[in-house]
Amino acid sequence: MCERSLYRAGYVGSLLNLQSPDSFYFSNLRANGSQLAALPPISYPRSALPWATTPASCTPAQPATASAFGGFSQPYLTGSGPIGLQSPGAKDGPEDQVKFYTPDAPTASEERSRTRPPFAPESSLVHSALKGTKYDYAGVGRTAPGSATLLQGAPCASSFKEDTKGPLNLNMAVQVAGVASCLRSSLPDGLPWGAAPGRARKKRKPYTKQQIAELENEFLVNEFINRQKRKELSNRLNLSDQQVKIWFQNRRMKKKRVVQREQALALY
């Protein structure tokens, strides 16, 4: 057990105004920085005093960084913040921590007073945006982002918006053709991801009477024609090879239906 004795350095040194070990390097300074005017400097080391020796078990363990500054911290500078010199693994404590101050470091109270903006992930923002427009059937004026572009880009958007501002009449007749034309013209403009319109189909050109007469005469001679005869007919009648082929196919089906109808009438 370590006993508190009046002969320890902490008690006797304060009564006799003894200096700290660092004061041997600065003979005119005390431990707190003030000058010692009355007493002359002591020339013998502190360990020679009989009451200055302390057992090893009573000596508190101090970190290596504390001895570099003589066991006390540097004076505080105005407008500065503390920076600790302890290693990350050292135990935190008010008596073991040694700090010095730099003018650029902000104080801890200022850092705590700063409010940081709350972080919201992108998925929650998208979810909150969709929540307001998913089941919103009551608000006619509010529309989804995709439908807003359709209403703005369509030529009949102004008249449609004016109709929706007033009270809705369920018995009102809607012009389907006009609405369909507006939607058809606005869908390719408002939906860039949609499928591109396919190749426009050629307008069907009806056969002239002269062409039909020539094809009928050839059909009476032979219902099935070969490729050479079909090519001659297409060149003579100013038709394509595909048109001549399709006409003969349709003519054979027409003849087959006529024969089936005659057979059905003969049974009854």
Swiss-Prot record:
One of its GO terms (biological process) is embryonic digit morphogenesis. Belongs to the Abd-B homeobox family. The lineage of its organism: Eukaryota, Metazoa, Chordata, Craniata, Vertebrata. It is found in: Nucleus. Sequence-specific transcription factor which is part of a developmental regulatory system that provides cells with specific positional identities on the anterior-posterior axis. Keywords: Developmental protein, DNA-binding, Homeobox, Nucleus, Transcription, Transcription regulation. It comes from Mus musculus. PANTHER family: HOMEOBOX PROTEIN HOX-D12, HOMEOBOX PROTEIN HOX-D12-RELATED. GO terms for cellular component: nucleus; transcription regulator complex. This is Homeobox protein Hox-D12. Residues 102-124 are annotated as: Disordered. It comes from the Eukaryota. GO terms for molecular function: DNA-binding transcription factor activity, RNA polymerase II-specific; sequence-specific double-stranded DNA binding. Residues 200-259 bind DNA. InterPro entries: HD, HD_metazoa, Homeobox_CS, Homeodomain-like_sf.
